Amino acid sequence: MTNIRKTHPLMKIINNSFIDLPAPSNISSWWNFGSLLGICLILQILTGLFLAMHYTSDTMTAFSSVTHICRDVNYGWLIRYLHANGASMFFICLFLHVGRGLYYGSYMFMETWNIGVILLFAVMATAFMGYVLPWGQMSFWGATVITNLLSAIPYIGTNLVEWIWGGFSVDKATLTRFFAFHFILPFIIAALAGVHLLFLHETGSNNPSGLSSDTDKIPFHPYYTIKDILGALILILVLSSLVLFSPDLLGDPDNYIPANPLNTPPHIKPEWYFLFAYAILRSIPNKLGGVLALVFSILILALIPFLHTSKQRSMMFRPISQCLFWLLVADLLILTWIGGQPVEHPFIIIGQLASILYFSLILIMMPLASLMENNLLKW
């Protein structure tokens, strides 16, 4: 008698994706982040669902409803902080996942990579709209500043912004629609993640060497299931430590002040995971130029497969490219730091230099380094 796992239409899909899936024998812990992102997404959807049961998306009561969740709902404080810090963990895993893809040449799987870029945009949009919902000072002014950027689009800009706002400023209509979009987007993200996996399983996983691993495959279960469980335990440990010991570490104190359209906070800044893009936006004195740089700073990921000039896929055996990769990582950390600083000397010039370096590394230096390495190997 055949196993139900291999015959049942639904079980067969699960079996071929998570149990009998042939996986390379040498993938390192850098390949754990896909499953961790799945765990983060499930956690965010579940905690978000319970928060939505008690939240009201009206400007008069939104802030109070969040306070009510934290004070009066059973374990409401835990659900709220798991959701807020879960977003930070989500982005940490995302950045590491993308970084892994860049380092080991996973972007050569074009369909998987492009869906991944769309996923990144979708998660960023979701996080931005979620930050607006508590209706604190930083929620309101963050929404005002970021949506206002669209007014830089020639001819249709102003109309577009007012259409998104549902009025002439960020108000009740804006909050209500942001709540609606914030609720629906994670389910769209889950569907896209399914497509992401579908495309990945067409080709099979990449591995650290960047070479074909068809000759040396092992079953996903038990080898990588147990490995993913270890990753999940570490994720849960870090998240629970953050939530239970310093839940407000990554938040902005200004968001504990109810939104006031008449009082602008001294330093408007987004959550830490957007600071690098915010620094790039601010480093260009022109509004439209800044917006284009902001969008292109993420969209540039879609160009990376076309900028691959090396004859090797992975950076494992390419020391010059490795140096440039880690320079890029350091540059992104500098941009993150600058994004949280006020707009004054010397932060302005540091931000501008870091922004120039960011684009130069990806568009010019890394492709040239790859060509140089090809010549060093006399290929």
Curated annotation (Swiss-Prot):
A Pfam family reported for this protein in Swiss-Prot or TrEMBL: Cytochrom_B_C
Topological category with respect to the lipid bilayer: Multi-pass membrane protein
Location in the cell: Mitochondrion inner membrane
Co-factor note (free text): Binds 2 heme b groups non-covalently.
Keyword Secreted: no
Binding site for heme b b562: H83, H182
Listed name of the protein: Cytochrome b
Species name: Mogera insularis
Organism taxonomic ancestry: Eukaryota, Metazoa, Chordata, Craniata, Vertebrata
